Amino acid sequence: LGYITCPGSNLGTLR
């Protein structure tokens, strides 16, 4: 993790 996985989250660590 640590990258933008979802367009909704800027951090991308949550999802």
From Swiss-Prot:
Presence of the UniProt keyword Nucleotide-binding in the record: yes
Cysteines engaged in disulfide bonds, as pairs: none
Lipid metabolism as UniProt keyword: no
UniProt keyword terms in alphabetical order: ATP-binding, Kinase, Nucleotide-binding, Transferase
Enzyme class: transferase
PROSITE patterns from the UniProt entry: PHOSPHAGEN_KINASE
EC number: 2.7.3.5
Residue spans crossing the bilayer: none
Reactions catalysed: L-lombricine + ATP = N-phospho-L-lombricine + ADP + H(+)
GO molecular function, one term: ATP binding
The family this protein is said to belong to: Belongs to the ATP:guanido phosphotransferase family.
Quaternary state and interactors: Homodimer.
Protein name per its UniProtKB record: Lombricine kinase
